[in-house]
Amino acid sequence: MSAAQSAVRSHAEAVQVSRTIDWMALFVVFFVIVGSYHIHAMLTMGDWDFWSDWKDRRLWVTVTPIVLVTFPAAVQSYLWERYRLPWGATVCVLGLLLGEWINRYFNFWGWTYFPINFVFPASLVPGAIILDTVLMLSGSYLFTAIVGAMGWGLIFYPGNWPIIAPLHVPVEYNGMLMSIADIQGYNYVRTGTPEYIRMVEKGTLRTFGKDVAPVSAFFSAFMSILIYFMWHFIGRWFSNERFLQST
């Protein structure tokens, strides 16, 4: 076969080759997004989501939704702009959870023997469903940024409460009152640097009363609106068509 001849012999074979290339491209793009989103998550909210004794009512509730609304906004905008697919945020979050569970099982448990109920990742699926549903029903990025991103921030703590509630039960341990998550932190020693020597319910944000989770959630929701609005432009930028002019 010469260089000028086609590598396929029929239209059906050409279609099959095209579909194979599409699946290979989707496979590569999916894991590139999973890897980059996972690295972004680990470098930003990292420790607050690594350990059960860091999943508190103040910083974990505030930081995690703000820094993780980025990739869902961009991917959702791209898929909606190009293909009118309303599940970009959900697919993005499911990919992140896949990468996190692989990391927690093989690295945290397989190499360092931290138990899974000490290093489990947070659930972001409820917020992603809200983002996709609002965009699908409204078709407006502005409305999705205001309502959807606010729902993303507000639903984060209630969506994870069934998972972390058993670890926040107060117990007496050696004459001290602490949570089960704090006991896990004492028994599974990590690094000795000062930022790891903390207790989950010793925060200082007590101006608004006893429970600070609603304050943290509303602040996180407000910031998520701004971050979503900025990052959705990245997805729209990637969805633009560009042509090279012939000379």
Curated annotation (Swiss-Prot):
It is found in: Membrane. Coiled coil: none annotated. The keyword Oxidoreductase applies. The chain crosses the membrane at residues 23-43, 59-79, 86-106, 111-131, 145-165, 215-235. InterPro entries: NH3/CH4_mOase_suA_sf, NH3_CH4_mOase_A. It holds the Pfam family AMO. The gene is pmoA1. Its EC number is 1.14.18.3. Gene3D superfamilies: Ammonia/particulate methane monooxygenase, subunit A (1.20.1450.10). One of its GO terms (cellular component) is membrane. Products of both gene copies, pmoA1 and pmoA2, are required for full cellular activity. NCBIfam families: AmoA_BACT, CH4_NH3mon_ox_A. M.capsulatus has two forms of methane monooxygenase, a soluble (sMMO) and a membrane-bound (particulate) type (pMMO). The particulate type is a nonamer composed of three alpha:beta:gamma heterotrimeric protomers assembled into a cylindrical structure; the beta and gamma subunits comprise the bulk of the membrane-spanning regions and the soluble regions are derived primarily from alpha subunits which form two antiparallel beta-barrel-like structures each. It is a multi-pass membrane protein. One of its GO terms (molecular function) is monooxygenase activity. It comes from Methylococcus capsulatus (strain ATCC 33009 / NCIMB 11132 / Bath). This is Particulate methane monooxygenase beta subunit. Keywords: Membrane, Monooxygenase, Oxidoreductase, Transmembrane, Transmembrane helix. Non-catalytic subunit of the methane monooxygenase that is responsible for the initial oxygenation of methane to methanol in methanotrophs. At least in vitro, specific quinols can replace NADH as reductants. It comes from the Bacteria. The keyword Transmembrane helix applies. It catalyses: methane + a quinol + O2 = methanol + a quinone + H2O.
